């Protein structure tokens, strides 16, 4: 029975709860269809628009009423996992009911372990939250945080993007997956968590969702790692007259293309890096980058870019 880990982008879930309720129907149908064919499925998702919406809402409320409590970015991330999980689970259980399948779907609120010494914490560069007119206002609204001027649009909080090291509860996640459950985990890359002398503590940060899910895929011993995104293939010379789609590349070819700056840093590069991380972790590991609505075709080898060792 082949084990598949699927990574959904946060943008695939829309920009508000109403949109999201509709948009989760597609991945739910796709996941259950694969389950029906005998695959084991673990599903992960992004949360960029969702965590931004939650964090901005609390920030706006505090500007209206100073007595409104400040909600840390880490807690906003956990909240986003909760309501995305609710919508995904409801859609999955409805599809399981429709298909008359006895499987269970489970959602793990994910805390991803990172190193407190990660260099990213010395150079936070991921902007989050609302814009403020002045540096003073931004610092007042975001105590103990780094704020920067953002392209002439105002001042904004920035957080680090540390590398994932492990996941709290990974053995329970793996056990549930091996029992045949449809597992949802790794939302938004997980809430960054460090281990201190006194125990675990969450920290503000944004973990790359695809990289975190590639690590989870390794730990649950998946055979296939699929990243679903907005394009049907990975391209070189993207957007240029000599644009060329890639149907299958090996790790050596991928590294050569990366060195030639063929993949955009903020979009395709981290996806290719996540795929390499998974494929290089063992033998007979395959990764695919494909379009959101083409999951079955991608697994059948009809569409998408396959990355092999």
From Swiss-Prot:
What's any GO biological process attached to this entry? arginine deiminase pathway
Give the transmembrane ranges: none
Q: Keywords on this record?
A: Kinase, Transferase
Alphabetical list of SUPFAM superfamilies matching this protein: Carbamate kinase-like (SSF53633)
The signal peptide stretch is none
Picking any one GO molecular function of the record gives: carbamate kinase activity
A Pfam family it matches: AA_kinase
Q: Where is this region: Disordered?
A: 125-144
User: What Gene Ontology cellular-component terms does the record carry?
Assistant: cytosol
UniProt lists the family membership as follows: Belongs to the carbamate kinase family.
| Name this polypeptide is given | Carbamate kinase-like protein
